[in-house]
Every structure is written in structure tokens, then in C-alpha cells.
Amino acid sequence: MNGEDIFKSIVSGEDQSILGDVARAGLSLLSKGYKKAVTMRNAKFDANKGVVKVSVPVISVGNITAGGTGKTPMVRLICDILGQKGFHPTVLSRGYRAKDNSQNTIISKHGTILVEPEESGDEAWLLAKVLPKSSVIIGRNRIESARIAIEELGADYLVMDDGFQHRALHRDKDIVLIDASNPFGYEHVLPRGLLREPMEGLARADIIVLTKVDQVDPGLVAALRKRLARMAPQKPVYETIHKPRAVYTLEAWANGDEGHPIGTDVDLPIMAVSGIGNPKSFTKTLEGCGYDVVHTMGFGDHHDFSDDDVVEIWKQAFAHQAKAIMITEKDAVKLSQLHTFEDLKIPILVLSIGIEFISGKQEFIENLEI
């Protein structure tokens, strides 16, 4: 169990030990200070202080909890939609885990990738790879990134990745993603829970998208909708699933070659390996495709894989008699850079995942219009 798993076992209440109780009490005290600071910050932005509006439309994609909710595939979908309408969107990413995100760096220009993954961070580089007609810029200063996008790249639309709490840049549409399997981060703000801000902040959202609704009971989804109707009245709520798009060999994915249809390798017992916010969700997605998942190895979100990790992955695959290893696209960004991983004598497969609407996609597209 890694540090992230230990933390989640504490804040979720799964750890019922005395130490777990003590930890929760301490985290609750810290949460009070965090909540006060966030509330004061939000009050400033609610008064429109320190907010900069740029000359082109801005769409923000974010969430209210820490961890993965599906922002990357949603940003990809929005850029594809805008591209089909004839626009030239640029993605503004913070560049989490980039070598230096204090600088504003152009990662890709109209589909041409300009830097290596370690310079940009895994998520920004993945977006640059899968958006052949868009540009990607990283940097903590989103206002400066917006200026570069407009003046140097000719952007006529900006898509701010993970932007719900980055309020200094005015946005014309605020899209909030909520993971239906853990919608409100154990009902507490950080660090006692996973909420980045109090749930009342959802009232700022223009559009709410529930993700992974296929991984929870329909009754829970209905209850979640009722709760959202109270917290964010009159705001449209859409239900989506994480829909696998294709499977690639690691070499084919790295080279930009074609993948093959989902289900081609379902006869192979596979081991799921991921360094994402919700490894169990990845396993459920694979099982939903018919794959025989014999073992799951979950690392921390944005994990920096090492040669030692590769050795352990191989040992676990051998111990569980896996005939292939399945990884996410985000992890493929880093693992494709490790020669030891490429040398494993077992097929390495990459699952590409997109967002699919249960219903209301056309209405969602219309609501994007500014």
C-alpha cells in the first residue's frame, strides 16, 4: 500500500484503528484552516477582484475534488468539437509535475510537439499528442499563458485544463466533472477529505458532467442528481461513461500508429498497471470490456516510474500468470521512456479512453457555444 492509499484509507474511514482516529482528528483541525482560506479567496473572486478577461472565449474544465475525474478526455472532446466548428483552440495547463511550470512553455504548436515529456508533465504532453490540430501551453500563470496563446499562436478559443479553482482568468463557461463513484471526496475539504473547496462552490458551475456513472448503482446516480439540484439549481447535469476507444501496443502508441478494436485481446489474462487517481476505476473499465484482469497494480497519481518499478511489475505479472500488461495513456507517456519497460518479455498494451454521453451530447455541445 503506497502513501496515497494509506491517506485514502484514513480519510474514507476505512482505517478504523486508533491511529486512524487520531489522524482524522488532526486532519480535521487542518481542514478548518484550509476551508477558511479558500472561502476568503473565493469571496475576493466573487467580488470580481483580480479577475482578468481576455479577448477570446475561455472554457474551463475542472472538478471540486482532488484526483482523477476524467478531465483529460473531456478536454480532448471539447477541443475536437471546437476544431470541427472551425476554431483553433489552445489548451492552458498548469503543467503538474513539469520540470519547471513557473515558466510559461509552449508544449505543442498546432499539433507539433516541441518538448519532451519530462519538460511538460504527463497530462500536458498526452494532450499535445492526442490533439493534432490544437496547441498546448503550460504554466502556473494562466493569464500569461492566455496572452501567449492569443498573440503568438493565434488561438481563437482557450480551454483551461483543471481550471475551476484557478479563478484569476475569467471564463465564459465553467464545466465541472464529478466522479459518480466518489462525488464529494468523503464529504470533507482537504486534508480531511478530498474536496478542494466547500461543495457550495458548485453553484459557480455552468455545466456539470457526471463521469463513470456505469460504475455505480443507478439509484445512487439518481440520489446524486437530486443533491446537485439543491446545490446548483437550474444547472444542466449530464451523465457520461469512460468509453475505451482502442488498444495499442506500447510501440505503436509511441510511434503514433493505428490501434486495434476493443476486445481483440480479451482471451489474454492481463495485469492492470496504473499511476492515476483511481486505479480501481481503470480495472472496472477493463473488466467492462470483457478483459480477464488477474491482478491490479496501482501506483500513486502522476507516479514517476523507475527501473525498480519495472522489475516489480514483471515479478507480479509472472506471479499472477498474466500474459499481457495493460496501462493507461497517461502512464504510457512515462513508461515509453523507460527502456527496461520496453524490454519486458510480455506484451505491453495501452488503453485509450474517451468520454461517452449516456444522453444529451448534442445539448451539451449547444451549451458550449459562447
Task: Annotate the PLM regions.
Residues F87, Y96-K235, E239:
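Phosphate/Mg2+-binding loops and adjacent switch elements
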Residues H88-L92, V176, P269-V273:
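Conserved beta-strand elements of the Class I
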Residues N42-G111, Q215:
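Walker A (P-loop) phosphate-binding motif
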Residues V61, I137, I178, T240, ...:
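Hydrophobic residues at beta-strand termini and immediately following loops
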Residues K323-K330:
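Acidic beta-strand-to-loop metal/phosphate-binding motif
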Residues M1-E14, P183-Q321:
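C-terminal accessory "lid"/substrate-recognition subdomains
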Residues N2-P57:
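A transmembrane-helix-recognition feature enriched in membrane-embedded lipid enzymes
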Residues K243-R245, G300-D304, L344-I370:
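Short, flexible loop segments at boundaries between secondary-structure elements
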